[in-house]
C-alpha cells in the first residue's frame, strides 16, 4: 500500500516538510539502480541499521535537514536514506503509558520481491513491563477473626465491587496535566499518577474497584461520556429493579396507590423505569438488601445486570405473586391483549423515542417499525390465546430484553473506540465463578483472597490491553500500514523476597490478538479462583481443569499452571505483568538524489573501513566524509546480494 507524506510524518514523528524533503518511496521495483546496493536488500539494510545508522536510536530523533541529529556522521545535514514507518509511533505509545521498563529487540528486515514489486519491511518485538503490589488486602482479607466473619467480609467485598461496577455515573473528568511544588515548571500527567497509585492494592484498597472502567470513561469524549453514563444508568436501574422485585413483594402491598405505576400506562414506560430505579447503587442500601437475600441470588442479579446487553445470564427467579416489580404493578390486559405482548409490540418505537431525547447527535436515525393495528374487539382466536395466564417471568424477561435492546442501540451510537468493550467484560466471569463457589458452599479465606487478587490483576490487564488496542489497532493510520503479528502476556507472581512463585504465559496471533488475550485471561483466572485452597490437583482432575481454563499449546509450562492453582496466595506479594507484541511495518526509501548520493558515499566509506578491519565511527561522530571513489561499486557489505546487470 502506498504511503502518503502525511501518513509517513504521523508515524515517524517527523514534520511534513521533513518528509517532503525525504520524498518517501515504498516500492523500488525498476528503481533499484538509483540506490547503493546495500540500501536495497534486507541483509544490506540490516548491516546499515545495526552498524552505520543505528536506526533503533536514530528513528527517535528529529531528522529534519540541518537539525542537530543530522549534522555529522552519517547524515551530513540530510535525513537518512530510509525511514521505518511506525517504529517511532510504537516507541512513543509505549513511553506514554505507565510501564516501568520497555525493551525493543529483534529489529529485523525482510524483503519481498516479485514481478512488479520490491519492498522491505521491518519488524520488532516490544516488551513492556510493570509490577503491581498484590500483598495483603488489609481491609478485609487479613482480619484476625476472618473465619468468624466470613459472610460479612464476603458481602463487603462483593458490595463494594458491585457499587464500582454499577454506580459509576459521574466519573472524574479533566485530568490533563498540572504542576507540583517540587517539580518546578515540569508538567505532571495526573492521570498517569493515578494509574501509578492503583498499582498498589495495599495502598488503594477498595478504591481499586472499577479502575478499568474509570480510566475508560475518563478517556472518552463528551458524547461518549453521555452515552456511557446512560448505559450505566440502564444497568443500574435493571439491577435495582431485580432487587426490588425480590425484596418488596410484601412491602409493595403497603405502597400508597399514587406511587404505583401501572404498566404499560403509555408507550414510554422506560422513562418511568429509569426515574424510579436508576438511582446509583448505594453501599449502605446494598448491604441492607444483602441481609435479607441469599448471597447466590444477589450474585445472579449482579451477573444479569452486568452482562447486558448479552444474555440472558443467570436470570434470577423472582418471588412474589402477581406481576410486580417494586413500585411497578401490571394491569392484566390492555385492549384485550396481554401486558407483556403490548410491551413487546411497542418496544422498538419506545426505545427510539428514549434515545432521541438524549442530548447527543445521533449517527443515523432509524425508521421505527410501525406497530401492528389491532381492533378494539379482539378476535376469537386472540381471546382463546389470551386465556393462557401470563407469568411473572415473561414480564421480567421482557423488561430485560427492552433494556438490552436500548443498550445495544446506545452502543451503536458510541465512537468505535468507546464501543469496543470486550476488554471490560471480565467482571461477569468472576461473578459467575463466585456464584458457582456459593452454590458449592466453597467460600473460604483462600477463595476470597484469590478472587480479590485476580480481579485486581484483571483490572490492570484489561486497562493495558485496551490502551494498546486503541493506540496500535484502533488508530487507523497505524493499523493501515503496520501489522500486529503476535501478542503475549506474561504474569509472574513473586513472594516478599522477590522469588518467582509461578509464571503464566498467554499467546495469541493475528490482528485481534489483544482482545483474544483478554477473553482467555479472564476465563483462565476466574476458573483458577475455584481451585484456591484445594492443594495440588489429582491426575484425574488435571484434564478437566485444563479444559476449564481453555489451555492452548505454546501457552506456558503446564507445571507452572498446576503450581498456580495449588499455591497459597498469601505468599504472593507482587505480580509482574509483561506485555510483549511483535509488529511489522514498511520501510520507505528516499527518492531525493542528494540523499541517495550521500548514502552511497557513506556505504563506500563504511565498507572500506570494514575491509581494513577498522572500527566504524560512532553515531554523530565528527568525521569528514570522503568523496566517492572512481569505482562505483565499493566492497559489498556482509551478505549483500550482487547487483544484476541488465
UniProtKB/Swiss-Prot annotation:
Site keyed Cleavage: positions: 175-176, 326-327
State which gene encodes it.
Answer: PTP
From the Swiss-Prot or TrEMBL record, state where the protein is found: Host nucleus matrix
Q: Locate the coiled-coil region(s) and give their ranges.
A: none
Composition bias type Pro residues, residue spans: 624-640
Q: Which GO terms describe its cellular component?
A: host cell nuclear matrix
Q: Where is this motif: Nuclear localization signal?
A: 357-366
UniProt lists the family membership as follows: Belongs to the adenoviridae terminal protein family.
Q: Which InterPro entries match?
A: Adeno_preterminal
Keywords carried by this UniProt record:
Covalent protein-DNA linkage, DNA replication, DNA-binding, Host nucleus, Phosphoprotein, Viral DNA replication
**Protein name, entry field:** Preterminal protein
Which lineage? Viruses, Varidnaviria, Bamfordvirae, Preplasmiviricota, Tectiliviricetes
Q: List the source organism.
A: Human adenovirus F serotype 40 (HAdV-40)
Q: Does the keyword NADP apply?
A: no
Amino acid at each position: 500500500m502506498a504511503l502518503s507524506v502525511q501518513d509517513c510524518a504521523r508515524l515517524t514523528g517527523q514534520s511534513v516538510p521533513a518528509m517532503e524533503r525525504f520524498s518517501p518511496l515504498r516500492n523500488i521495483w525498476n528503481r533499484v539502480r538509483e540506490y547503493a546496493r546495500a540500501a536495497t536488500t534486507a541483509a544490506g539494510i540490516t548491516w546499515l541499521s545495526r552498524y552505520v545508522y543505528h536506526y533503533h536510536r536514530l528513528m527517535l530523533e528529529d531528522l529534519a535537514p540541518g537539525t542537530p541529529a543530522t549534522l555529522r556522521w552519517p547524515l551530513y545535514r540530510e535525513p537518512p536514506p530510509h525511514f521505518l514507518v511506525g517504529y517511532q509511533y510504537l516507541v512513543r505509545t509505549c513511553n506514554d503509558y505507565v510501564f516501568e521498563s520497555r525493551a525493543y529487540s529483534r529489529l529485523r528486515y525482510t524483503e519481498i520481491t516479485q514481478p512488479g514489486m520490491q519492498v522491505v519491511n521491518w519488524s520488532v518485538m516490544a516488551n513492556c513491563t510493570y509490577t503491581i503490589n498484590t500483598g495483603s488486602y488489609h481491609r478485609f482479607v487479613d482480619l484476625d477473626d476472618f473465619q468468624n466473619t466470613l459472610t460479612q467480609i464476603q458481602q463487603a467485598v462483593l458490595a463494594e465491587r458491585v457499587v464500582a461496577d454499577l454506580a459509576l455515573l459521574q466519573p472524574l473528568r479533566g485530568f490533563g496535566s498540572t504542576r507540583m511544588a517540587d517539580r518546578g515548571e515540569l508538567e505532571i500527567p495526573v492521570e498517569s499518577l493515578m494509574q501509578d497509585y492503583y498499582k498498589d492494592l495495599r495502598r488503594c484498597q477498595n478504591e481499586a474497584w472499577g479502575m478499568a472502567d474509570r480510566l475508560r470513561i475518563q478517556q472518552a469524549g463528551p458524547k461518549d461520556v453521555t452515552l456511557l453514563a446512560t448505559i450505566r444508568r440502564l444497568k443500574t436501574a435493571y439491577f435495582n429493579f431485580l432487587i426490588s422485585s425480590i425484596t418488596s413483594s410484601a412491602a409493595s402491598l403497603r405502597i400508597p396507590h399514587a406511587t404505583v405505576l401501572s404498566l404499560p400506562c403509555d408507550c414510554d414506560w422506560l422513562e418511568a423505569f429509569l426515574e424510579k430505579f436508576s438511582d446509583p447503587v448505594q453501599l449502605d442500601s446494598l448491604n441492607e438488601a444483602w441481609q435479607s437475600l441469599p448471597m447466590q441470588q444477589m450474585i445472579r442479579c449482579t451477573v444479569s445486570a452486568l452482562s447486558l446487553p448479552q444474555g440472558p445470564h443467570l436470570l434470577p427467579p423472582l418471588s412474589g405473586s402477581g406481576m410486580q416489580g417494586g413500585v411497578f404493578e401490571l394491569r392484566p390486559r390492555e385492549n384485550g391483549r396481554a401486558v407483556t405482548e403490548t410491551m413487546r409490540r411497542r418496544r422498538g418505537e419506545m426505545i427510539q423515542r428514549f434515545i432521541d431525547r438524549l442530548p447527543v447527535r445521533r449517527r443515523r436515525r432509524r425508521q421505527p417499525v410501525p406497530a401492528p393495528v389491532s381492533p378494539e374487539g379482539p378476535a376469537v382466536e386472540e381471546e382463546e390465546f389470551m386465556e393462557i395466564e401470563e407469568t411473572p417471568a415473561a414480564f421480567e424477561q421482557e423488561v430485560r430484553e427492552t433494556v438490552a435492546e436500548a443498550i445495544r442501540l446506545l452502543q451503536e451510537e458510541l465512537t468505535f473506540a468507546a464501543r469496543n468493550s470486550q476488554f471490560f467484560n471480565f467482571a461477569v466471569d468472576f461473578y459467575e465463578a463466585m456464584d458457582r463457589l456459593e452454590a458449592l458452599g466453597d467460600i473460604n479465606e483462600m477463595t476470597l483472597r484469590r478472587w480479590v487478587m485476580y480481579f485486581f490483576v484483571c483490572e490492570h490487564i484489561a486497562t493495558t490491553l485496551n490502551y494498546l488496542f486503541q493506540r496500535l489497532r484502533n488508530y487507523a493510520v497505524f493499523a493501515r500500514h503496520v501489522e500486529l503479528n503476535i501478542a503475549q502476556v506474561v504474569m509472574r507472581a513473586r513472594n516478599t523476597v522477590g522469588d518467582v512463585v509461578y509464571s503464566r504465559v498467554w499467546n495469541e496471533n493475528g490482528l485481534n490478538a489483544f482482545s483474544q488475550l483478554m477473553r482467555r485471561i479472564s476465563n483462565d483466572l476466574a476458573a483458577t479462583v475455584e481451585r484456591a485452597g484445594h492443594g495440588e490437583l489429582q491426575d484425574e482432575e488435571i484434564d478437566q481443569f485444563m479444559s476449564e481454563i481453555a489451555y492452548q499449546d505454546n501457552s506456558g509450562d503446564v507445571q507452572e499452571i498446576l503450581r498456580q492453582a495449588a499455591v497459597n496466595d498469601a505468599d504472593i506479594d507482587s505480580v509482574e505483568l509483561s506485555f510483549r507484541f511483535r509488529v511489522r511495518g514498511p520501510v520507505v526509501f528516499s527518492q531525493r538524489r542528494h540523499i541517495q548520493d550521500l548514502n552511497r558515499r557513506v556505504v563506500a566509506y563504511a565498507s572500506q573501513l570494514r575491509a581494513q578491519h577498522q572500527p566504524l565511527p560512532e553515531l554523530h561522530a565528527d568525521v569528514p566524509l570522503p568523496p566517492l571513489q572512481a569505482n562505483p561499486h565499493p566492497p559489498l557489505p556482509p551478505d549483500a546480494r550482487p547487483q544484476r546487470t541488465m
